[in-house]
Amino acid sequence: MGIAYYNLNNRREALNDYKILVSQYPNSPEAEDALDNVKTIYIEESKPNEYADFMRQAGRPLSMDAEDSLTYAAAKTQYDNGNTNAALNAFNSYLQKFPDGVYAIEADFNRAEIYNGKKDWNNALRAYEAVAADAPNVYAERAVLAASRIYFFELKNYEKAEKYYQQLKDLTTNNENKLEAMRGLLRCQYQLQQWTEALANAKDLADAKGSSTDDKALANMTIGKSYQVNNQYDLAISNFKLVVQNNKAALAAEARYEIAACWFAVNKLSDAEKAAFETINKSGSYDFWVGKSYILLGDIYFKQKDYFNAKATYQSIINNTINNDLKNEAQAKLNKVIDEEANSSKVNN
């Protein structure tokens, strides 16, 4: 009768019949079959603890390993059937009971996937990071990739994203994931202005098979920045010029400005002025870099003791920009020009 009830989806009656059979004929072949069917029902209903209790009462207590496997199987059944809320509760119960269980890594990964699907980023990350911390394992690469993306795209936490993109780069043998790791790592280092630290990875990305034109532009920009902060201006300018060749958007505007800044740093003021005007004329839709270029022109005039044009240039930024950082920078420099001009007049008088 138990089988008939089960086929009719009447699990309660099926369980009762199986339990009676086990109780009355514990050593019969039929009892063994009944025990298997009881196990199936409890797993399908995600009630592993009740099954363990039943087996103890039947005089057949489960081993710790068997209970571990059973508890996980119940959770996985819910997950495979798309019952994500029930699966999540079951995975959490499994990990609470078996934190170092045979399936702990798999349970953490599966619950991370559920949390990720719900956009519960913090809980997803806790689970993904637990899997990543136990690398190498079969789920580590996917966990590290997911953690990287959440930190970078959703939370804008570039320090954490950098950590996991680096781990992904070290872990993966998949070319697509390797490219994403290098690209993500470089974007993090760019946001964090870690120019010197980014140099090796930027060169890797620039030379990587399958890297895009945008990848190469960002890599060359970063390489240029690395040389620039280390006062290797010729090498910096060479890489910034490669950016201009490979990119027609914001990176090109920034690269043009940085070329001008490098010329200014080595006191080649004519070249700096020419490069600043090139930024203004060829990247006119990028207000920030146009503003920075005008400020640099003011710096050039100031260095040449051309106080009139320096003041006029800084004042034009103050009057026209909506960027408060640029406005404040121009105002501070204008004040210096006014002070120096006043002091110069006193000396001449």
Where are these regions (language model features)?
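Acidic, polar-rich low-complexity tracts and alpha-helical solenoid repeat scaffolds
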Residues: 1-349
